[in-house]
Amino acid sequence: MILDADYITEDGKPVIRVFKKEKGEFKIDYDRDFEPYIYALLKDDSAIEDIKKITAERHGTTVRVTRAERVKKKFLGRPVEVWKLYFTHPQDVPAIRDKIREHPAVVDIYEYDIPFAKRYLIDRGLIPMEGDEELRMLAFDIETLYHEGEEFGEGPILMISYADEEGARVITWKNIDLPYVESVSTEKEMIKRFLKVIQEKDPDVLITYNGDNFDFAYLKKRSEMLGVKFILGRDGSEPKIQRMGDRFAVEVKGRIHFDLYPVIRRTINLPTYTLETVYEPVFGQPKEKVYAEEIARAWESGEGLERVARYSMEDAKATYELGKEFFPMEAQLSRLVGQSLWDVSRSSTGNLVEWFLLRKAYERNDVAPNKPDERELARRTESYAGGYVKEPEKGLWENIVYLDYKSLYPSIIITHNVSPDTLNREGCREYDVAPQVGHRFCKDFPGFIPSLLGDLLEERQKVKKKMKATVDPIERKLLDYRQRAIKILANSYYGYYAYANARWYCRECAESVTAWGRQYIETTMREIEEKFGFKVLYADTDGFFATIPGADAETVKNKAKEFLNYINPRLPGLLELEYEGFYRRGFFVTKKKYAVIDEEDKITTRGLEIVRRDWSEIAKETQARVLEAILKHGDVEEAVRIVKEVTEKLSRHEVPPEKLVIYEQITRDLRSYRATGPHVAVAKRLAARGIKIRPGTVISYIVLKGPGRVGDRAIPFDEFDPAKHRYDAEYYIENQVLPAVERILRAFGYRKEDLRYQKTKQAGLGAWLKPKT
């Protein structure tokens, strides 16, 4: 199993290293025969001798083309002959490429920016993560001491915790009497002990949570300050910290550094991405949070260190569990794309598609287009019409079906052969013409991207069939990871066409796909309304909610299935409309904002959720009760009564203060905040009292009644004393409870002022409620 690849330099020449796991043992394969190269398209092939004479300087060494060969390739589906120019060292390419490009005989140069080790994996047909080797995994986490205003890495590391299949342990330099704690004498000894643990356990995978941007950099800085060689690589090297966009990325040679943070941000939509806020939705169990100021207080006083050690241990354990959960999926993406898991786990979906296309282009003898320069990038910012959205029918509706197109955009790309190499191509016998925009796509041959996409969808269907057939739960889970990885890639192609930095960028392709999408959804809606008696309540891009007013549930379900039998044979190619669900009740507020309830009383909402931590418990609880009243009981008036009851209790100060706590995270150094929100104001007052506040600290506060700005009246919740303090009921009514329910009840004709307990006026309710069956 290939873990990763890189290159080193020996005697001025590159040596490829392939890090592998074979039969349970780690090994490194070396290849000294692979040469860096680029392609050049010439106006006149006789100019090749002049091209070979071009020189440049790199670190005092003269750089030139070492040899050249003429090769037959394809470019965007058309035959082309190009020159393959070889060089001594990969770093020669950036030193000389502009000089070659500027030669009058050169039309352009290609594939000059593909990293050497990645080029090697593609050209040699090597696929990382293939095989059934069992990889050893170890997760680690650190706790640090931070004082406001300190430079990064100035405060000591207090604890290093780690977890693997044998359990979780904590290394620290204070005596803590717990069975999983190992105490050493100093911070320096703690770091050295951790390095020894890595050496002894020799993991193939190091799992962190934001290790790219915190743990590794902090450990490396403290190691330098303390005179410790921070060697973690299997080749005896220190971790390599490199910039990747606006973030950092850390490589450990011979080991996969699997940072969960970018993976989870790409995979799950959450309001915040702390370890605690991620762990609960993934595993369904809360994880305790110990705040930075509590850690500092415990460390400096010596009281409560057991709790901090337990928290540190549980951090490592949670990171390990999350790593085990997410690693198999990234391994499948790595296999699918053909690049290392280290790269894949830090890539956007657009980059995943691009690496997949680069490999397939090589396999099909295609020269890849270049990435855009700054001028071209600016030109690619022009927008175009997106998917169709029908404004929702207001009111409370019953017996609703949801129908949507199966993989709408991928199906359109394949069915209509939408690809840069088929776009407006002259001399074809047959074209598909996109509605509204008029772009033509040749149907005489399969386009590069539609053919690859078709292969992916076909493979996914085969994998899903295997899933159904197997009785082995482990095999089924692995197959499920595989089909999900394929789905991620397949669903990214439309977005890739519109991705400004893409090699195979095609605005005409993207706007043609959405134009066909609009046509199909609008035609389908018209057919179901005119021929089957449905009323479409809301539609968005690839699906719609519909009902038959006055009909019972069985009638609506049966008629929907009749419609599918009618419409699907009339759709071209891979286009297929599916029955996605039935809901006994629902309402639709505005675009992308609705709530429905199924026959098992499961409520699904979109655009109405208040899951951010800066909503108090009373706001979340009130919204949940309002949704239940409307959807479960079909009673909008009950929902209004609930809101009035809550606002009345708030006004009378009958709501427990615990339900009014607001949590907000400090995301940067306090000195860099210009706007002082309540959480920042509270944090600054805490810091002034000596409590350590750092980025990531979550501030819990409650707003008191009184004059002045909200920030001046917000206090830490643990300082709230019911005997001395009164919370600001008006603040919680106007800024928490009413905003949480107003957009829901507005759909039924209620205004904000109608929802407070002292007002009883109802605005036009009868016009909004639909008859129940």
Swiss-Prot record:
InterPro entries linked to this entry: DNA-dir_DNA_pol_B, DNA-dir_DNA_pol_B_CS, DNA-dir_DNA_pol_B_exonuc, DNA-dir_DNA_pol_B_multi_dom, DNA/RNA_pol_sf, DNA_pol_B_thumb, DNA_pol_palm_dom_sf, DNA_pol_type-B
UniProt binding sites for Mg(2+) 2: 141, 143, 315
Transmembrane stretches, start-end: none
Region (N-terminal domain): 1-131
Renumbered residue ranges of the record's region Polymerase domain: 390-773
Annotated GO MF terms: DNA binding; DNA-directed DNA polymerase activity; exonuclease activity; metal ion binding; nucleotide binding
Activity regulation, short description: DNA polymerase activity strongly inhibited by uracil-containing oligonucleotides.
Cofactor detail note: Binds 2 magnesium ions.
Short name of any one Pfam family annotated for the protein: DNA_pol_B
Catalytic activity: DNA(n) + a 2'-deoxyribonucleoside 5'-triphosphate = DNA(n+1) + diphosphate
Binding site for Mg(2+) 1: 141, 315
Disulphide-bridged cysteine pairs: 428-442, 506-509
Xref: SUPFAM superfamilies: DNA/RNA polymerases, Ribonuclease H-like
Region (Exonuclease domain): 133-385
Enzyme class: transferase
EC number in record: 2.7.7.7
Gene Ontology BP terms: DNA-templated DNA replication
Cofactors (names): Mg(2+)
Keywords (A to Z) from UniProt: Disulfide bond, DNA replication, DNA-binding, DNA-directed DNA polymerase, Exonuclease, Hydrolase, Magnesium, Metal-binding, Multifunctional enzyme, Nuclease, Nucleotidyltransferase, Transferase
Function: Thermostable DNA polymerase. In addition to polymerase activity, this DNA polymerase exhibits 3' to 5' exonuclease activity.
Family label: Belongs to the DNA polymerase type-B family.
The protein's name in its UniProt record: DNA polymerase
Gene name of the encoded protein: pol
